[in-house]
Amino acid sequence: MYDYIIVGAGSAGCVLANRLSADPSKRVCLLEAGPRDTNPLIHMPLGIALLSNSKKLNWAFQTAPQQHLNERSLFWPRGKTLGGSSSINAMVYIRGHEEDYQAWEQAGGEYWGWKRAFALFKKLEHNQRFDKSNYHGTDGELAVSDLKDLNPLSKSFVQAGMEAKISFNGDFNGAHQEGVGFYQVTQKHGQRWSSARAFLHDVIDRPNLDIITEAHATKVLFEDRKAVGVSYIQKNMHQQVKTTDSGEVILSLGAVNTPQLLMLSGVGAAAELKEHGIALVHDLPEVGKNLQDHLDITLMCAANSRTPIGVAFSFIPRGLVGLFSYIFKRKGFLTSNVAESGGFVKSSPERDRPNLQFHFLPTYLKDHGRKIAVGYGYTLHICDLLPKSRGRIGLKSANPMDDPLIDPNYLSDPEDIKTMIAGIKIGRAIFDAPSMAKHFKREIVPGPAVTSDDEIVADIRSRAETIYHPVGTCRMGKDPASVVDPCLQVRGLRNIRVVDASIMPNLVAGNTNAPTIMIAENAAEIIVRKVDMASLDASIGFTRQNLEPELL
């Protein structure tokens, strides 16, 4: 029997396994549906280009047909290995905007506000450039670094942004977010530094930590609304793990799988569970609701030179040099995360904060990397940072081996399409600036014929895709309608918590890996210190005596 059963070894689960097993008197079990993270493509940064096609390492979900995207069903990759999506993502280290966490504080109290989050980000971080910065940490396990080998086109993009009257920002996680610049990444010595590498690998042999991979969780076991274990399937065999009398089940499967597992276990909207013949354990209607994600549209251009990372016979000599440089020195273009530079901008000057994010790629990227785009070109990803549209996760069936229903409901709020139109126009202005214009051969998409707002809207509806940041489906809050309380305990149940991106009340303005890791660190302290709702003050959140002194 275990004191803690953690379901999901992703960005959050690896942190929890590390922190909760630090007490040798506590037995911890970590269940992961995917395999161990031994595939070399995980650890070689440019391997990201091939991971979308890996069914072994990727859930490879498909959404429901999207009403406002021409009824298209969108591809939703999610990590399925130790490290979860931090093992297949673009490694971009972004915390979000301070105002994001002010909204979290309104929802869940002081323990989830910016002051607390900022201290935890610094505690977790081992930044290899900002060693004397007030905004970064150097003693944590999560390695954060500059890219080792920037493509010249990425530098040209930043210069062109400045020529287009966008200020340079040397640190998107510093004093302010707005501007163009180069992304820092979760890498160490030219290799991906996933949550598994940062928090799990060094403690994997702890005698009180059992890691069970290729274990597909099928149900949380309850006795009188108390979680007592988890059922899973491994190699076609049905298995169970149980908790001690005071033990806990912690769900860290992410914004898609966590609500699915809750519903399969009898926790969710009673009507939906009845529809699928699932016995009700607890009627919790908000499970799976409040789904938020960043929708993305691309500008793609052909280049007039061989400067980009190309797919062509002429690239073979450069590719071989890069391969040997990576093998022997951990340098060269294979250390690229592809999304090397970018920025945060406002769709209109009167806004008080950025609502658009750019990821610039010095290469072609087609269909999430699943299709090969031959030649030399470059791509700008443009996403709506603060979407107003809300969707849901539901069930397709009561079979735990079936994928859930994923309905992001993209562009259901008309404000979102207006933001994306502005993003296309700003992106084109950057590409028209001298430093990028000198590389330009032709615009591939949307294409030179797409100029009016109506034409841009039609293009967005026909091409927009996810940029992989789903959150919010087990919303945290002080209000009784929320799925989890500020201690991340599932409302109406005992001995079960949710700790992953699904608890976010609102989507952060940026990439979600770093905030998810921070959530897990905060949750671990809540659990270890036995903070409960009795520790809350109705007006200010957690009492100060429950905070670590160095985090005040």
From Swiss-Prot:
InterPro entries the record matches: FAD/NAD-bd_sf, GMC_OxRdtase, GMC_OxRdtase_N, GMC_OxRtase_C
Coiled coil stretches, renumbered: none
Listed PANTHER family: CHOLINE DEHYDROGENASE, MITOCHONDRIAL (PTHR11552:SF147), GLUCOSE-METHANOL-CHOLINE GMC OXIDOREDUCTASE (PTHR11552)
Similarity comment text for this entry: Belongs to the GMC oxidoreductase family.
Organism, as annotated: Pseudomonas putida
Pfam families linked to this entry: GMC_oxred_C (PF05199), GMC_oxred_N (PF00732)
Keyword Oxidoreductase: yes
EC number from the UniProt entry: 1.1.99.-
Binding positions for FAD per the UniProt entry: 3-32
GO cellular component, one term: plasma membrane
Cofactor(s) annotated in UniProt: FAD
Described function: Converts aliphatic medium-chain-length alcohols into aldehydes. May be linked to the electron transfer chain.
Leader peptide range in chain numbering: none
Protein name stated in the entry: Alcohol dehydrogenase [acceptor]
Membrane-spanning segments: none
Catalytic activity: a primary alcohol + A = an aldehyde + AH2
Annotated localization: Cell inner membrane
Disulfide bonds: none
Molecular function, one GO term: flavin adenine dinucleotide binding
Keyword Oxidoreductase: yes
Keywords: Cell inner membrane, Cell membrane, FAD, Flavoprotein, Membrane, Oxidoreductase
Domain of life, source organism: Bacteria
PROSITE patterns: GMC_OXRED_1, GMC_OXRED_2
Active-site residue numbers: H469 (proton acceptor)
